[in-house]
Amino acid sequence: MRTIISLLLLSAMVFAVIEAISLEEGLQLFEGERGCVGENQQCADWAGPHCCSGYYCTCRYFPKCICRKDSGK
């Protein structure tokens, strides 16, 4: 009986650790996107603000750099 209870507690602890790690990774991804700007917004790749996922920073007329939609090339 003690063995079964010990295994259940061990399983619960392993599950809690795995869940905490995946939650932390998700929060880090969200924090990385928080300060981003969208299409046709002013950006600066070297210092920020950075473009959101799916966009890239292009500087045709420095210092007027803007985010453009990434075509996936």
From Swiss-Prot:
As given in the record, the signal peptide range reads 1-20
Judging by the UniProt lineage, the source's domain of life is Eukaryota
* Gene Ontology CC terms: extracellular region
> As annotated in Swiss-Prot or TrEMBL, what is the tissue specificity of this protein?
Expressed by the venom gland.
Instruction: Show the InterPro entries listed in the entry.
Output: Beta/delta-agatoxin_fam (IPR016328)
Pfam families hit by this protein = Toxin_7 (PF05980)
UniProt propeptide residues: 21-34
The chain residues annotated with the modification Serine amide are: S71
Q: Which cysteines are joined by disulfide bonds?
A: C36-C52, C43-C57, C51-C67, C59-C65
Q: In which family does this protein belong, per the annotation? A: Belongs to the neurotoxin 07 (Beta/delta-agtx) family. 03 (aga-4) subfamily. Aga sub-subfamily.
Question: What is the protein's known function?
Answer: Insecticidal neurotoxin that modulates the insect Nav channel (DmNaV1/tipE (para/tipE)) in a unique manner, with both the activation and inactivation processes being affected. The voltage dependence of activation is shifted toward more hyperpolarized potentials (analogous to site 4 toxins) and a non-inactivating persistent sodium current is induced (site 3-like action). Interestingly, both effects take place in a voltage-dependent manner, producing a bell-shaped curve between -80 and 0 mV.
Domains as described in the record: The presence of a 'disulfide through disulfide knot' structurally defines this protein as a knottin.
- Other comments on record: Negative results: does not affect mammalian sodium channels (Nav).
Name listed for the protein in its UniProt record = U3-agatoxin-Ao1c
> Species name for this entry?
Agelena orientalis
